[in-house]
A protein has these predicted regions:
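Residue-identity detector for glycine
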Residues: 4, 8-10
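Leucine-biased recognition of intrinsically disordered, low-complexity hydrophobic segments
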Residues: 6, 23-25
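Intrinsic-disorder-associated, low-complexity terminal segments enriched in Asp/Asn/His/Tyr and depleted
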Residues: 11-13, 22
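C-terminal cap of thioredoxin/glutaredoxin-like
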Residues: 33, 42-62, 148-246
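Structural alpha/beta surface segment adjacent to cysteine/selenocysteine redox centers
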Residues: 41, 47-157
């Protein structure tokens, strides 16, 4: 090769053909065409982030590896005992504001998946609703419908249209919209509850190994992005690594 040209045996010099752009982009995308999302049903910021995660998945043509984790009250119960007294009021203000900013209907779930005194923040010993949601998320993820299940159930919990989200047919209808059968999910969990709980614990540990302790945390090529307010930074990073088909 000389000056970017191929030298033939007795032939005229030939210009090296350009490598097809679509193959270059395909190769780049194939290197790592997914993001990992650590996510909790009880986290309002997880709910607020999710529509933009879905948008990014479609925009860049990448998969979302859903990692459902326990709520913070189960991952780190000490947090509520040691938190700054200003943290809770600001949290309540900011979550409602962030939802409004992104055009999302918002109200805290009724009932709360976590049994917690609203004033003292003292936690109950058992949290059956939160544990059921987590295991349902694991079961949905195992069936390849984790992202859509979380979209539907988080709306059920957080958009304020339903009181008693855990009663009647609400969860069954949300599961159906995600292409799943709630009775089948519940039966699968009942057959092996410890395995589903272990999957949640593994995801809790994987979150910390990824470089953070809170949700939502998104990991792309080993780099963690914590918080719904880091999604634009993630989008910027993706444009550096993966072609935007739009």
């Amino acid at each position: 090769m000389r000056n970017g040209k191929l030298m033939g045996d007795g032939d005229h010099d030939k210009q090296m053909p350009p490598f097809p752009r679509d193959l270059v982009l395909e190769a780049r995308t194939a290197m790592k065409s997914s993001i990992t999302l650590f996510w909790s049903f009880r986290s309002p910021y997880s709910y607020i982030a999710l529509p933009r995660v879905v948008e990014i998945s479609r925009q860049f043509g990448i998969d979302v590896d859903m990692r459902i984790v326990h709520p913070a009250a189960l991952r780190n119960p000490e947090y509520f005992r040691t938190m700054n007294p200003l943290a809770r009021p600001y949290f309540m203000l900011d979550t409602a504001r962030a939802a409004a900013f992104h055009g999302l209907a918002f109200r805290r779930p009724i009932p709360d998946p976590i049994e917690q005194d609203p004033v003292t923040l003292a936690l109950a010993d058992e949290h059956p609703r939160a544990r059921r949601l987590g295991k349902l998320g694991i079961a949905a993820t195992e069936r390849g419908q984790g992202l859509q299940f979380c979209v539907e159930v988080s709306r059920l919990l957080w958009d304020g249209r339903v009181n008693g989200w855990d009663e009647g047919s609400h969860l069954a209808e949300a599961s159906s919209r995600a292409g799943l059968n709630l009775a089948e999910l519940d039966a699968s969990i009942a057959a092996d509850p410890d395995r589903h709980e272990f999957s949640l614990e593994q995801n809790d540990a994987a979150l910390r190994s990824a470089g953070h302790w809170g949700v939502p945390t998104i990991v792309f090529q080993g780099e963690p992005f914590f918080g719904q307010d880091r999604i634009d930074v993630l989008r910027w990073r993706l444009t550096q690594r993966i072609s935007d088909p739009d």
